[in-house]
Amino acid sequence: MRGEERWQEQPALASHPSRATLRPRGWPRLGLAPTGVGSSCPPAPASELARHLARRAPVSASPPVLPPIKDQGARPPTLAASAAAASSPPPPPPPPIPPLPPSTSTSAARPTDMAGVTSKRRSSSASTSSSSGDGAAVSDRPRGVTRKRRSGGRCPRPAASLRPAAPRPSSHHTAGLRVILQKELRYSDVSQLGRIVLPKKEAEAYLPILTSKDGKKSLCMHDLQNAQLWTFKYRYWPNNKSRMYVLENTGDYVRTHDLQLGDSIVIYKDDENNRFVIGAKKAGDQQAATVPQVDEHISTLFPIFPIAQVDDYLSPMAPQVDISAFVPHADENHEIFDGILNSLPEIPVANVRYSDFFDPFDDGMDMANTLNANANQSASLHVTDDKSGHSLIPNPKSGPHM
């Protein structure tokens, strides 16, 4: 009764937002009801967070009637609920799951609890042990949940859609092709310039003739490895009085076949289809393409008729005669050029003075020449040595001796 009187005498606080002010002062915050007869106080909130999140009640002198609190999810249990749960007997355990017999099919129902969830597809060893007639029970040990494999919605691809890759033709499959040009690539051919310098002799003999003023022509070539059509620019550069033939726009071809310094390109001629074919050859490739000589190409276009034997200087040389017959043979201790020089006769060199060129005539006809005014004196003073041939007393007015 004393608690009831204190509740009625306590004034209402209109500005307090919490329902905790409706409780009598001095209550223990344990969630228990007050010990008194006829107490009609509302129950205390479960926690401090619930007191702040609870809906505000209208302030009045009499205790309000609160609506029932809806279940908004799992809340932490109160001390009274924990004590009641501890005093109540535990629920009976669920019945054990019977093991599957070995003869049951895979379509039988499986347990839905997490302790019995297994992988959908068993391994071959597990299926072998379960299918054996030893009657061993399946282990009830819980396993981790595994991801299901989507096998029903995915259909296997038909065998016709998996077409095999086309066989790559060999780089030496040159049936019906004639080799007309082969070039070993240098640093300038595989650089970023994108052009390959061709040998002049083969380019002028087998490739198309450049008749335009700018000296350019588009040249299409089929790739020997993958039958791709390449379009190059065939041109020449004036080099003094000669020409230098170049194949431009070759950068993509070099990068496609990964050509490096020392590799080679081979150009073929397909006479049947009247086209050009280009192939790449690595440096380690032992099989080399045979390039025909220009004389053989000319002989096929213009056949050479046999020459009649004529007994004059125009008759051809006998085949058994070798050019070594005209070269003098050297001794074992001397070179061939030393033998040729030693076989030449010695040519005597005359002792001629420089002043003799200005005195070709006698003294009477050279009176106007002041350089030879003292010719008689210079002639009498000149004394030559027999061994050296030089003058012992040279004339200062005369020129140098030869």
Curated annotation (Swiss-Prot):
Keyword Transcription set for record: yes
Tissue: Expressed in anthers, pollen grains and young developing embryos.
Stretch list, region Disordered: 1-174, 381-402
Record's keyword terms, sorted: DNA-binding, Flowering, Nucleus, Repressor, Transcription, Transcription regulation
A GO MF term: transcription cis-regulatory region binding
Role noted for this protein: Transcription repressor involved in flowering time regulation. Represses the flowering activator EHD1 by binding specifically to the DNA sequence 5'-CATGCATG-3 of its promoter.
Stated name of the protein: B3 domain-containing protein LFL1
Higher taxonomy: Eukaryota, Viridiplantae, Streptophyta, Embryophyta, Tracheophyta
Protein encoded by which gene: LFL1
